[in-house]
Structure formats: structure tokens, C-alpha cells
């Protein structure tokens, strides 16, 4: 999950800027990224946060969360092709990056979903390509390290369908052949969620044996770009995400990994924004623990897509404007509530649990711009504030 943030420059020199939504900006504290990053990947080892790839190309950066005044330090460049939406997690003191999508070579006609895996060693500051292939496409998936040293992976786009669609789209000149182009797009985007064949297994990768396994099937529609928070050892909350291109779900699920299997439990959906505005769900939101609660912030959706899908119009986002959300929700383990607002609508950045709240790193704004700002969403169970 990668996502983004607000306007730090406006906060310089301001001790506290109150927002009508209940958010407050405090004194500057967290350093900006060297470059804007959206659709990248992130992981954490101890007090070190790592972010890169996506719009940053092969760049990779680290921040000491215990000493943020040192700023982001550039680490060794990723050695694979530049990739968006890779699944990344830490295990055994190293960072593993799986799949993602991009061009295999600079002169490739269309992007593909990669089936490759790489490992980063902070000790040697170096990347290596692993001698393995992902069993399925894992672009848009979420990865998380387990206590036994393995890595669990949820969701992911179907490589065969994704690659073929982008190759077919790339082969048509939409200006010269508008009808053929529209027919192709309508055909792909008009399928029901099940037809996209997104990964519905909870895959598990074992770095020690360099092998793959499964923790069982997801009983729900699989998601890409959901928000994810660790609730405890082996317990993970998956929130919202896409169920097909352009259509999100408001559902949230608790996954408990026990005795070699993943056990799923549906919890409360994200709440409607008002009596007149139903919850569309979001993709690319930020998430993490803040005290006893889980915060989910931002993300992107298409207002009206749920209504279209309910009416059987499966190209649900056709003609709809994409919306970058600024809503922040808090989950107490039973119910959700609206906690406040981000400084601006953001999605597809990184988030890290931090003392007192959730650290929001980079992401994409409503103009599609990759952002550099970093800030802390502080939550005391009642009020939300923003610390830069």
C-alpha cells in the first residue's frame, strides 16, 4: 500500500494551524522525502523505515524513526526494472520486494506484471535477485512478515489478463481507431469482479527455503491496494481496496494466521460519509495502529461507482471523476468512526506506526503529482492532529 500527504510548506513558522475538520498542524518535525514517491513500496526493520520505487524509479531511501533529524538517507538503487505497486515486507532483518508492474526494458511497448523477487540487505546496502518466480501476479498485493520468518501475501492482479490487456491497448492507435479502442476498453472494464481472477490465495514465501506455499483461500472477493494494519502477532486488518478496476469495497476483514492457515472474519464496513453519501470504499489508503485504534486515511475512489455496479453496470467508473479522499477513520476493534481530515486528499503512499500516531509518507495528490511531504497523524482516541 503506498499513499501521500499534505502541504508542509504552509505550516512552517506556524505553531498550530486549526482546520475546521478537527485536524491541527503542529511545529515542523518530520523531514520531507528527497523526491516525491507514489505507487512505491515500503517496509520497516526496527526503527528504520524504508521507502522507494514507484515514481522514484529505482531510488530507495531510509529514515531512522528514532532520529528523524538525520533525514532520509539514500540507499542502494533497486537493481530490477523500475516497478510500480510491488509487494514489500521485511523478514529476518532483510527486505523482500515481489512483483509490481512496469516495462521490462526501456523500449518495451507496454508494461507487464513482473513475476520476479528481490532482496535488500541493509547490512551490506545491496540488492540481489532471488532465484524464484512469484506463483501469480502480485502487483497491488500486500505483504507482511510473520513471526516464523516467512512472508504472507494478500491479493494481486492477474498477470495473464493484465499483460494481454495492456499489450492489446498499446497496439491500437486510439486517435485513428477510436471505435476499436473503445470496444477493447469496454470489454475489459465491463467484466464482473470474479472475471479478473485476482489472487485469492494467501500466499506465503519462506526466505530460508526459497519456496512458496499457501495459507488457504480468501473466502471474500480478493482486493488490490487495500489498506493494511498489524493488530497483533499473526493478526492483520485488511481494509477496503479494489475488487476490480475502478470499483472499491467498503468491507474490512480481520485475518488471523494460526497453525499454518489463514482464518478470515468480516468486521464492520467503513462508515458512510453522511446520510446522503454512501461509502464507496478506497484504494491506496494509509493505515496503521495509533494507540488502541487503527487509523485509515485517504485513498482514492470514483463517486458513483457503487451505484453503477449495483445497477449491473460493471464498467462502474466509466465517465466518473477519480477522487482523492482526505477522510480519516478510526476503528476501535468493533466500530468505525470518522476521526477527521488529512490536509489534502492523498493516496498510494506509505504509512508507518509511530509513537502517538501514524506516519504518512509521500503519495499522490488530486493532480496526480507525487508528493514529498511526511507528517504524523496524531490520535488520542478523541481528536486528530497533524504534526509535520
Curated annotation (Swiss-Prot):
Swiss-Prot/TrEMBL catalytic activity: N-acetyl-alpha-neuraminate = N-acetyl-beta-neuraminate
A GO cellular component term found in this entry reads: periplasmic space
Q: Does the keyword Repressor apply?
A: no
Instruction: List where in the cell it is found.
Output: Periplasm
Per the UniProt entry, the Enzyme Commission number(s) are: 5.1.3.24
* Coiled coil start-end: none
Give the enzyme's main class according to its UniProt record, as a single word: isomerase
Q: What is its main location?
A: periplasm
The residues forming the signal peptide are 1-26
Q: Where are the Kelch repeats?
A: 48-92, 94-147, 149-186, 187-232, 236-285, 307-356, 358-387
InterPro entries noted in UniProt: Kelch-typ_b-propeller, NANM, NanM_proteobact
In the UniProt record, does the keyword 4Fe-4S occur? no
What keywords sit in the KW lines?
Carbohydrate metabolism, Isomerase, Kelch repeat, Periplasm, Repeat, Signal
A GO molecular function annotation here is: racemase and epimerase activity, acting on carbohydrates and derivatives
Which SUPFAM superfamilies does this entry report, sorted A to Z?
Kelch motif
Q: Which Gene3D superfamilies match?
A: Kelch-type beta propeller
HAMAP family in the record: NanM
Describe, as the record does, how this protein assembles with itself and its partners.
Homodimer.
Functional summary from the UniProt entry: Converts alpha-N-acetylneuranimic acid (Neu5Ac) to the beta-anomer, accelerating the equilibrium between the alpha- and beta-anomers. Probably facilitates sialidase-negative bacteria to compete successfully for limited amounts of extracellular Neu5Ac, which is likely taken up in the beta-anomer. In addition, the rapid removal of sialic acid from solution might be advantageous to the bacterium to damp down host responses.
Alphabetical list of PANTHER family matching this protein: KELCH-LIKE PROTEIN 32, LD33804P
Q: Which family does it belong to?
A: Belongs to the NanM family.
This chain's protein is named: N-acetylneuraminate epimerase
* UniProt organism field: Brucella suis (strain ATCC 23445 / NCTC 10510)
Please spell out the taxonomic lineage of the organism that makes this protein.
Answer: Bacteria, Pseudomonadati, Pseudomonadota, Alphaproteobacteria, Hyphomicrobiales
The gene name on file is nanM
Amino acid at each position: 500500500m503506498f499513499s501521500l500527504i499534505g502541504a508542509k510548506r504552509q505550516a512552517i513558522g506556524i505553531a498550530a494551524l486549526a482546520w475546521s475538520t478537527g485536524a491541527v498542524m503542529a511545529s515542523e518535525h518530520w523531514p520531507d522525502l528527497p523526491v516525491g514517491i507514489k505507487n512505491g513500496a515500503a517496509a520497516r526493520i526496527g526503527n528504520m523505515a524504508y521507502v522507494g520505487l514507484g515514481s522514484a524509479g529505482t531510488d530507495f531511501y531510509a529514515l531512522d524513526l528514532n532520529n528523524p533529524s538525520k533525514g532520509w538517507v539514500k540507499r542502494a538503487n533497486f537493481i530490477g526494472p523500475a516497478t510500480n505497486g510491488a509487494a514489500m515486507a521485511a523478514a529476518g532483518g532483510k527486505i523482500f520486494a515481489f512483483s509490481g508492474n512496469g516495462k521490462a526494458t526501456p523500449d518495451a511497448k507496454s508494461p507487464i506484471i513482473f513475476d520476479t523477487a528481490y532482496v535488500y540487505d541493509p547490512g551490506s546496502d545491496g540488492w540481489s535477485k532471488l532465484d524464484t518466480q512469484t506463483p501469480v501476479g502480485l502487483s497491488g498485493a500486500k505483504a507482511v512478515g510473520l513471526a516464523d520468518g516467512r512472508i504472507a501475501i494478500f491479493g494481486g492482479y492477474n498477470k495473464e489478463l493484465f499483460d494481454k490487456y495492456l499489450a492489446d491497448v498499446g497496439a491500437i492507435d486510439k486517435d485513428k481507431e477510436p471505435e476499436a479502442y473503445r470496444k477493447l476498453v469496454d470489454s475489459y472494464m465491463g467484466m464482473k469482479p470474479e472475471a479478473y481472477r485476482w489472487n485469492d490465495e494467501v500466499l506465503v514465501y519462506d526466505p530460508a527455503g526459497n519456496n512458496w506455499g499457501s495459507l488457504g483461500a480468501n473466502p471474500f472477493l480478493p482486493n488490490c491496494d487495500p489498506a493494511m494494519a498489524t493488530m497483533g502477532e499473526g493478526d492483520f486488518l485488511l481494509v477496503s481496496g479494489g475488487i476490480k478496476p475502478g470499483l472499491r469495497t467498503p468491507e474490512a476483514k480481520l485475518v488471523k494466521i494460526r497453525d499454518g492457515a489463514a482464518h478470515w472474519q468480516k468486521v464492520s464496513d467503513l462508515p458512510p460519509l453522511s446520510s446522503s453519501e454512501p461509502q464507496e470504499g478506497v484504494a491506496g489508503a494509509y493505515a496503521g495502529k495509533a494507540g488502541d485504534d487503527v487509523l485509515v486515511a485517504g485513498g482514492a475512489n470514483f463517486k458513483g461507482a457503487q451505484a453503477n455496479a449495483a445497477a449491473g453496470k460493471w464498467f462502474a467508473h466509466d465517465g466518473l471523476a477519480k477522487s482523492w479522499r482526505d477522510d480519516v477513520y478510526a476503528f476501535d476493534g468493533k466500530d468505525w468512526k470518522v476521526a477527521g481530515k488529512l490536509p489534502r486528499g492523498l493516496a498510494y503512499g506509505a504509512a508507518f506506526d509511530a509513537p502517538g500516531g501514524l506516519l504518512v509518507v509521500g503519495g499522490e495528490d488530486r493532480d496526480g503529482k507525487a508528493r514529498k511531504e511526511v507528517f504524523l497523524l496524531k490520535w488520542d482516541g478523541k481528536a486528530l492532529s497533524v504534526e509535520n
